[in-house]
């Protein structure tokens, strides 16, 4: 053994080392896979058991149903038991047919719930001020009308009186105040609330809260009122809970003859309220009109686009006047509604007209602008052969000779490329400044409010660059910009053929309407023959203006133009005055003159090359801006142009009233 030596080919013996990390990981992974397979197998077995149990339950259920069908006795027992149960309070029969009504009034929130269903909830900031009114069907309890009247603002109480008077007797009325509803609640409105049985409504004070439920012409079901303790605070919130008994269906329905017109009327009157005699059971007002045809009607096949939103009572009034106008073609009318509102479409269906709804795009001014674009595009797509389109809005009254006015003047748009549009509206045509329904003007502004648009202008110029949805622009102000108008003018009448009656809208309220729209003159004379229509073409109009200026009597420029004595007490004369206007955009004196004449003064409208035309004391009155107007050459050398300096601005002057 002493001479033994280890073989150099054999690896020396050493102690066993620890397993490597790789082998450890591989071992654990193998165990995890085994565990996963075990879990999967268990899940499959569980699913199989579940399926077997479900199949057994289905078979047992079918067998039970089969046995029940063979023995009718259990069904009879069930029916007897069901008959002993109390029916649902809203739809059941018998003396328990009542509605549970909750009405809440407070400074910042109102809500109304009927049988646990909220039918009104308004807690938006700076919106919904005034008296909210809901009308329920007395037989079914469903909501027939929802309105809000901002009786803090002028004339909204008149709108509320009109609405409540047009609600049929027997309907359930619910009233509630948000924020403030008394400031312009006049005696007529208070007397009406008193006639409805309200005790607190006629005594409603500054910032009081009030809730009321009653039947028109019937009993009051509940009323709550909280007075404001001080001018700077509001009344406490009030919550009125009351039961309203339902009437029979017989009491809520009218029995008209079964005609196509009355079927339309019945569908309408069963759903909505506030439309007066159209739903009268005894003597309903007509919903079909037969105005005299218009001889040689040049606009018979011109499409009419009515731009509408969610103001159905406005739309109803507008469509009645439109369908009563001589020369109207109902099949050419399309009402475009911005949003999927039911009631405006109900109004459209009542009159048997075409209505199109679309999804609103954008917000505020941009939403209105996109609505106009979509409506104009759709109009020309619906009538691909039409060269023109008449554009109206839902808050306009239409004169009886509206289509006659357009028929006599529309050829000017075809023959004179210097024209932008024909409008039925005169921005400066007030009761004291408009006189001659046969007289037309050319003006540099686009008045809108009932106008004719040329297809080529829209498709080639306006549509491709119409303001996009992110631009919060007014569509009409955009159309008046020099880039769009490009020196072209519009034809307007001295006496407007449309009347803007709407006092609720994006850019409208009672104060604004009172100041700038209420006293506009509106033609009511049928069959007016327009005078010297072809003299409105570009070159001919210049000849006419120079003739008028040459014949006009120059007024005494030493007198105050704002005084009534500035014009003599005559009738049928033509007078001219010259005012300072240093350059084309210098309207300092004109703006002050417009203010004292109580006409449109918010921007410059109704002018033609520095010339304004209107009537005062039934005399034709012309005003020329010197030296900017080319008609300045008519100024006698001895006459000094009138200059009216604007008053200094008062610091901290209050603006228009907002939410209280």
Swiss-Prot record:
Annotated spans, Disordered: 68-96, 637-660
Binding site for a carbohydrate: 129, 179, 207
Region Interaction with O-glycosylated substrate glycoprotein, residue ranges: 473-481, 506-512, 600-605
Cofactor-binding details, from the entry: The manganese ion interacts primarily with the substrate UDP-N-acetylglucosamine.
CDD domains: GT13_GLCNAC-TI, PANDER_GnT-1_2_like
Tissue expression from the record: Constitutively expressed. An additional weaker band is also detected in spinal cord, lymph node, and trachea. Expressed especially in astrocytes. Also expressed in immature and mature neurons.
GO cellular component, one term: membrane
Modified residues (Phosphoserine): 7
Impact noted for substituting residue 287 to S: In RP76; reduced acetylglucosaminyltransferase activity
Pfam families xref list: GNT-I (PF03071), ILEI (PF15711)
Keywords: Congenital muscular dystrophy, Disease variant, Disulfide bond, Dystroglycanopathy, Glycosyltransferase, Golgi apparatus, Lectin, Limb-girdle muscular dystrophy, Lissencephaly, Manganese, Membrane, Metal-binding, Phosphoprotein, Retinitis pigmentosa, Signal-anchor, Transferase, Transmembrane, Transmembrane helix
Residues reported to bind UDP-N-acetyl-alpha-D-glucosamine: 307-311, 338, 371, 394-395, 506-507
Primary role: Participates in O-mannosyl glycosylation by catalyzing the addition of N-acetylglucosamine to O-linked mannose on glycoproteins. Catalyzes the synthesis of the GlcNAc(beta1-2)Man(alpha1-)O-Ser/Thr moiety on alpha-dystroglycan and other O-mannosylated proteins, providing the necessary basis for the addition of further carbohydrate moieties. Is specific for alpha linked terminal mannose and does not have MGAT3, MGAT4, MGAT5, MGAT7 or MGAT8 activity.
Family, as annotated: Belongs to the glycosyltransferase 13 family.
Protein name in UniProt: Protein O-linked-mannose beta-1,2-N-acetylglucosaminyltransferase 1
